[in-house]
Amino acid sequence: MLILSKLPKTWIIDIDGTIFEHNGYLKGKDRLLPGVKNFISKIPENDFILLITARTKENETRLKDELREFGIRFNQIIFGAPVGERILINDEKPSGLSTAIAVNVKRDSGLNIEINYSDAL
């Protein structure tokens, strides 16, 4: 479960193995993983969603079409990301609020993550 502040956020979400089946696009068409639509629907409209993928820019039109077809909203996509670790470094708020959170999910298991927003953070 994610317990988050009510401040606007930036969500950085990998595509393959997280939103769509890993390398599914190589078999023809992407397959949406369980819980993804529900998870994305719980992200407030004023939050920024940045998707990231190792897919090349040549896949842009097809990928954006499939995301829209499945109703997955996003603000921006980074293509051609390396396949290694993704590292986020951010400062901590003076209040002590951690502004960098990492969630690792098992490949192709979907996004069955509960989100709760707290006034206390």
Say what each PLM segment does.
Residues 1-121:
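HAD-like aspartate-dependent phosphatase fold
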